[in-house]
């Protein structure tokens, strides 16, 4: 009997192609019919393009980046923690539907339709007894965070996309360990991909002192994570149920301006008051979704009575993630833009939204609203960077003023309208933040905060370069090619 190596190799190759074709057909069926309610049309077409242009590679990419998330599995350990807040949400919805807004705050009354929409989410209840401070520099922020950790009396909860155990990370971990020695409860929830250089073993001493640590969507396989595409991008700190932080700064030396991108410009909020309850609720839900030990239940110590009148800044906390069809933060941003009468100020390091969001911005600009968009001048993710610029032509021709921040890297995620309302948090203005990642933003109805952040934005403009229609039209052909390629796959970036 004679064997032909070339024939056998050809047969094997044919079999592999056939298997790949069958797998792609099955995946195409799943994407089109079984996951149609979880995907936009552009995302569906982008995945089909990848599957059929790169059959076997497309299958591997789908395993890591394409699968959807089960809400049932995420929420299975929530117990009774939502019961009291469901009642509060229902009460506020009924009151708003009757025109009873429960406050004399002018911005809440004026933008009651935005408030009502955000009440559709479990974190979205409106609170008014709040004092808000803002930070745009990482050194200032973490100096204050370390002071607040030192003054903690009962517990500290941290939830971070990136918790780097470098200089800053070690300082914070040491401060937390000191509080454990004093008998406080300390929990850390970090993202397994965002904190890719962190291992659970790095927290052995912390855990030996009584601290608890969980990794979000942790992989059991080294270097492989089948939830690569659905990351917990939230950055939250809660101290004693009285004080909370939320915003764009991660934990690491890079966010102090010590990384390769230079000065790090971001926006973060420090909140004292009733809105901390919403941040605490979000932390508990996220912890319960990942923990393998006894779960959080509702306990009054986690939602204590606040220390007297603190301020009059109405706040709603909005969360979004891939397990929900209701894209709370995207819709909140869009509603703000569509409600603007005078001005819109937007900052986002990654700007790759869908057409409906782009159209909302264009409609506002064409209606005479003064619309500003600030993006980075340098890439930390090249493909995302070029996709960001691919939307510039339509926006510029509609009258949107676009700036590229030149004084380092802008990582701020902010939407501000009419010097009246501002949203600050973790959600970039892109498909990933709107639909794939777990995000959290604060919507603050406070003219003083809005004006302060607008002044900070105007200072940023002095350190930026304005993009014009002429300069954009004259960009090199190689840049145009990169933008076109990036835009083609932007729904899955």
Swiss-Prot record:
<keyword id="KW-0472">Membrane</keyword>
<dbReference type="InterPro" id="IPR030874">
    <property type="entry name" value="Cardiolipin_synth_Firmi"/>
</dbReference>
<dbReference type="GO" id="GO:0008808">
    <property type="term" value="F:cardiolipin synthase activity"/>
</dbReference>
<feature type="transmembrane region" description="Helical">
    <location>
        <begin position="13"/>
        <end position="33"/>
    </location>
</feature>
<dbReference type="Pfam" id="PF13091">
    <property type="entry name" value="PLDc_2"/>
</dbReference>
<keyword id="KW-1003">Cell membrane</keyword>
<dbReference type="GO" id="GO:0005886">
    <property type="term" value="C:plasma membrane"/>
</dbReference>
<dbReference type="InterPro" id="IPR027379">
    <property type="entry name" value="CLS_N"/>
</dbReference>
<keyword id="KW-0677">Repeat</keyword>
<feature type="active site">
    <location>
        <position position="411"/>
    </location>
</feature>
<protein>
    <recommendedName>
        <fullName>Cardiolipin synthase 1</fullName>
        <ecNumber>2.7.8.-</ecNumber>
    </recommendedName>
</protein>
<keyword id="KW-0444">Lipid biosynthesis</keyword>
<feature type="transmembrane region" description="Helical">
    <location>
        <begin position="45"/>
        <end position="65"/>
    </location>
</feature>
<keyword id="KW-1133">Transmembrane helix</keyword>
<feature type="domain" description="PLD phosphodiesterase 1">
    <location>
        <begin position="228"/>
        <end position="255"/>
    </location>
</feature>
<dbReference type="InterPro" id="IPR001736">
    <property type="entry name" value="PLipase_D/transphosphatidylase"/>
</dbReference>
<dbReference type="Pfam" id="PF13396">
    <property type="entry name" value="PLDc_N"/>
</dbReference>
<comment type="similarity">
    <text>Belongs to the phospholipase D family. Cardiolipin synthase subfamily.</text>
</comment>
<feature type="domain" description="PLD phosphodiesterase 2">
    <location>
        <begin position="406"/>
        <end position="433"/>
    </location>
</feature>
<keyword id="KW-0594">Phospholipid biosynthesis</keyword>
<feature type="active site">
    <location>
        <position position="413"/>
    </location>
</feature>
<comment type="function">
    <text>Catalyzes the reversible phosphatidyl group transfer from one phosphatidylglycerol molecule to another to form cardiolipin (CL) (diphosphatidylglycerol) and glycerol.</text>
</comment>
<keyword id="KW-0443">Lipid metabolism</keyword>
<dbReference type="InterPro" id="IPR025202">
    <property type="entry name" value="PLD-like_dom"/>
</dbReference>
<dbReference type="InterPro" id="IPR022924">
    <property type="entry name" value="Cardiolipin_synthase"/>
</dbReference>
<feature type="active site">
    <location>
        <position position="418"/>
    </location>
</feature>
<dbReference type="GO" id="GO:0032049">
    <property type="term" value="P:cardiolipin biosynthetic process"/>
</dbReference>
<keyword id="KW-0808">Transferase</keyword>
<feature type="active site">
    <location>
        <position position="233"/>
    </location>
</feature>
<keyword id="KW-1208">Phospholipid metabolism</keyword>
<feature type="active site">
    <location>
        <position position="240"/>
    </location>
</feature>
<keyword id="KW-0812">Transmembrane</keyword>
<feature type="active site">
    <location>
        <position position="235"/>
    </location>
</feature>
């Amino acid at each position: 009997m004679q064997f032909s190596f070339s024939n056998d190799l050809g047969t094997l190759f044919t079999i592999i192609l056939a298997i790949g074709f069958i797998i792609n057909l099955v995946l195409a069926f799943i994407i089109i019919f079984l996951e149609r309610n979880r995907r936009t049309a552009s995302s569906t077409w982008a995945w089909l393009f990848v599957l059929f242009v790169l059959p076997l590679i497309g299958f591997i990419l789908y395993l890591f980046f394409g699968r959807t998330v089960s809400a049932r599995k995420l929420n299975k350990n929530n117990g009774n923690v939502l019961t009291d807040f469901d009642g509060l949400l229902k009460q506020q919805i009924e009151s708003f539907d009757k025109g009873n807004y429960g406050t004399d705050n002018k911005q809440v009354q004026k933008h009651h339709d935005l408030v009502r929409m955000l009440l559709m989410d479990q974190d979205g209840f409106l609170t008014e007894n709040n004092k808000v401070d803002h930070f745009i520099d990482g050194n200032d922020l973490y100096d204050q965070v370390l002071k607040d950790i030192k003054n903690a009396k009962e517990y500290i909860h941290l939830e971070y996309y990136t918790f780097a155990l470098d200089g800053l990370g070690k300082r914070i971990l040491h401060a937390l360990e000191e509080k454990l020695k004093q008998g406080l409860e300390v929990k850390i929830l970090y993202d397994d991909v965002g904190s890719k250089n962190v291992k659970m073993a790095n927290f052995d001493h912390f855990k030996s002192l009584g601290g608890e640590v969980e990794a979000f969507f942790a992989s059991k396989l080294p270097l492989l994570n089948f939830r690569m595409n659905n990351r917990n991008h939230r950055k939250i700190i809660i101290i004693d149920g009285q004080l909370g932080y939320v915003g764009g700064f991660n934990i690491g030396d890079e966010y102090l301006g010590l990384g390769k991108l230079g000065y790090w410009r971001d926006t973060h909020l420090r909140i004292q008051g009733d809105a901390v309850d919403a941040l605490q609720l979000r932390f508990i839900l996220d912890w319960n979704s990942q923990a393998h030990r006894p779960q959080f239940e509702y306990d009054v110590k986690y939602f204590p009575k606040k220390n007297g009148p603190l301020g009059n800044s109405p706040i709603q906390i909005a969360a979004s993630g891939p397990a929900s069809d209701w894209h709370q933060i995207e819709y909140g941003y869009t509603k703000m833009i569509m409600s603007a009468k005078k001005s819109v100020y937007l900052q986002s390091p990654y700007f790759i939204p869908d057409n409906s969001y782009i159209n909302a911005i264009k409609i506002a600009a064409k209606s005479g609203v003064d619309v500003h968009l600030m993006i980075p001048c340098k890439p930390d993710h090249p493909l995302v960077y070029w996709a960001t610029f691919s939307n510039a032509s339509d926006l510029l021709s509609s009258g949107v003023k676009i700036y590229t921040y030149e004084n380092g890297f802008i990582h701020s995620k902010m939407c501000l309208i009419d010097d009246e309302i501002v949203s600050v948090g973790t959600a970039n203005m892109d498909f990933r933040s709107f639909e794939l990642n777990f995000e959290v933003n604060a919507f603050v109805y406070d003219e003083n905060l809005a004006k302060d952040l607008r002044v900070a934005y105007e200072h940023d403009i002095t350190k930026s370069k304005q993009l014009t229609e002429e300069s954009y039209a004259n960009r090199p052909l190689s840049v145009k090619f990169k933008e076109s390629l990036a835009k083609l796959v932007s729904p899955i970036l």
